[in-house]
């Protein structure tokens, strides 16, 4: 059946558009228990399926650089007319920020003491020789009044924490609101890429301080060692689905700056083996090593033990697979999950042998800052 479906679509070499119809993909973090059957971790606390694959026959693509909007349909011009009419309605819709005071309040946050206690436990596991690095996360929970729309939360997050792999998805009564900076994996014309992020510093209050923080980050032996470890993990993951000898690091340890943090980023690529299907690619790389640790399976088990609550969408993925098998999938970090009046978010960081617990807690706050600022701008007391 899969082969018949794939044969219906021909690759259009003339198009520059990444998507001309295909499938939308959502993967919850707990999908790892289906990929690695021996892993047992806490179940997701959210009313969401573990994974979704939804057929998408119509799409809107916004080329921000060229300032062009493309309306796409596999079926008919009538579908495009419907999309166009929807856009006209949106253009006439008025937005308001009135009556939002006292609309958001924090109800729970993993305390600094609690987080630092678990950082120390990760370090203990490292010295016991069980792991080399683990990406421990910290939880914030809020009550948000219903008059605050999901779209408003997302629009504010796009302002306070603009990122290249952002998205909003409504699934039943749940909404995932993400401003992720990280790609898990992409595939185009048999070239597969992953772009690991590991190593963080907060943005400086002045230009000079920003430059100094970037210099300190890229020269940090701790951060470089952690990053190299995770690049090797990603190379190993890609090697499972790539032609022998084709995997390479084509961009090594560059600084990328976002609204609230600086990151060290690399790019790992390879040539995919013939007849490898999207499911095999996902099984090879999911969940990403940068948000679990090394070795991946043991880290996932330890993180489940320490965090105690399932992650759900956090550090899962969303993205697309197009009709001829190419794909682009993110890692759901800098992400909020909303269900009714309940809203939660997580932020984490990599723990290594010489980690300082207080600094690791500060890093989670720097990473959460864009999301917290979005809530505060609406009204956060």
Q: Positions of the model-derived regions?
A:
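Extended alpha-helical targeting/anchoring segments
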Residues: 1-381
